[in-house]
Amino acid sequence: MRKIIGILSIFLAFAFMSQAQKIKVACVGNSVTYGYGIKNRETNCYPAQLQQMLGDAYEVENFGHSGATLLNKGYRPYTQQEAYQKALRFAGDYVIIHLGLNDTDPRAWPNYRDDFVRDYLSLIESFRKANPRCKVWVCRMTPVWTATHREKSNEIPLGNENCVSRKPTPVHLEK
C-alpha cells in the first residue's frame, strides 16, 4: 500500500509540475522586436504587449537586437549576437522571427541576397534543434518608408515567402 501511495504521489507531483510550466514564446528580431525608439520600451515593445495579451500561462521573452541582419554575411548578423545565444538557451515553444529589414541595406542586399533564404532556413533549424517541438512563425516585413536608403525592401518579402513555404507560419505585424 505504501508503494502504491508513493508511486501515486510521484505521479501527481509530476502532473502538477507539468501543468505549472508556462508556454514559452521567443521573440527574435531586430530593432522592431527590441523596441528601439519606443517610449517605455520595456512595456511598449511588441513582445511586452504580447505577454500582456497572452497572460500568465505564457512566458514571452524579447530577444531583439537593434541593427541585426538575417544574412550571416551582413554587417551585424543576428546569429553573432548574444540575443541569439540567449534565445537558443530559452528554447521557446513558439519562436516568432522578425528579421530582414536591415538586410535591405546597400552593404548587404546587393552582395548577399542569394543567401537570404538559406540563412533564414538555417536560423529556423537552429531553433528547432534547441526545441524540436517548437513552432516557428516568420513575420512579414514591416513597411519601409520611402525616405530611406533601403530601396530593395520590396524584394525581401519574396525571400520570407520562400521560408514560409517550408513550414513556418507567417505573421503580419502591419496594421
Q: Which residues fall in each region the model found?
A:
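Bacterial Sec-dependent N-terminal signal peptides
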Residues: M1-Q21
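Conserved SGNH/GDSL esterase-like catalytic core that processes O-acyl groups on lipids
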Residues: K22-C27, V32-R118, W145, E151-E155
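N-terminal cationic-hydrophobic initiation segments that often serve targeting/anchoring roles
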Residues: Q51, I124-R128
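Conserved beta-strand segments of alpha/beta enzyme cores
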Residues: E59-E61, K135, T169-H172
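Generic structural signal for well-ordered alpha-helices
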Residues: Y84, Y120-E125, P157, E161
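Alpha/beta-hydrolase-fold catalytic nucleophile elbow
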Residues: H98, C139-R140
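A short helix->loop->beta-strand "cap" motif at the edges of active sites that frequently abuts
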Residues: A130-V136
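Substrate-gating cap/lid alpha-helix
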Residues: P143-K175
